[in-house]
Each structure stands twice: as C-alpha cells, then as structure tokens.
Amino acid sequence: MTPSERANRLYVRVMQYAESGKADSVTRFAPMVLAAHQMLQTPSIDERYHYGRVAEVVGAPEIVKAQADTILGLRAGSLLGLVLAARAERLEKNDSAARVFDKRLLQSLERELATQNPDYANHREEIDQAVADARLRKI
C-alpha cells in the first residue's frame, strides 16, 4: 500500500467514525490520519482537503486554515479550498471571514464544477451542503 493509499483509507475510516458519532474511535485514529498525511511528500489538493477535514473533526483550526490556504494558493477558486477555509473560520468563531469564503464559494461554483474535477465528484455531498448552507445564510 502506498503512503497515499494508507492516508486515504485512514481518512475514510475516521470520517465514518465521525459521522457515526463514535468520538472514542475518532480520538484513537485521528492522530494516525494526521501523521499519515504529514508523511506525504507532495500531497494533492484532495489529500490536503482530507488532512484539513480530519483536523476540523478533532478541533485543530490552525491545521484546517493552513490546508485551506495552501489549496487556495494552488487554485484560487478551488471549491474544496473554499469549503475548508469557511469551516476553519467558523471553528475560530469568525463568522464574518467565513461569510467571505461562502461568497467566494457561490461565485466560483459553476465555473469550478464545469471543470469536472474528479475531486469535486468525490466530495460532492460536502460541497452541496456547504453551498446550501451558504445560500441559507443569504450571502
């Protein structure tokens, strides 16, 4: 198994635990996921998103923010980067900054989806939820 495959499998496991409310399992496995992602030599945008999402689940906004910043530095309109950036700001109770990222998400949505980026297909539910939430906030 490659380091990337290992990191991805651990990510899937921890996110399943988080969605099932198994906090003890999240606490047990999250450090392994974070370590596996730190060992990736050239992480993809998708892998950076995974790293940020697990950091979000364990309440590490500085990691979430760093991954979002890196993703957006690589691709300014990245839906994954914008979703992650808004979540990072909300973790830090900075709703006004989160709304800025929500607005950018809505502005970038159609253009980015038109690229048919496979990462967007893999995380479509999360993107759709972030878009729905942003629209409810009446950005």
Which sequence ranges carry the predicted segments?
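TPR-adjacent "capping" and linker segments in tetratricopeptide-repeat scaffold/adaptor proteins
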Residues: 1-10, 37-43
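Soluble or luminal CAZymes and related metallo-dependent hydrolases
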Residues: 6, 63, 126
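"A position-specific structural signal for the A-helix of alpha-solenoid helical repeats
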Residues: 12, 50, 84, 130-133, ...
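Alpha-helical adaptor scaffolds
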Residues: 15-75, 84-88, 104-110, 118
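Exposed beta-sheet edge and beta->alpha loop/turn motif
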Residues: 92-95
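Terminal, low-structured helical/coil segments at or just beyond the last alpha-helical repeat
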Residues: 99-139
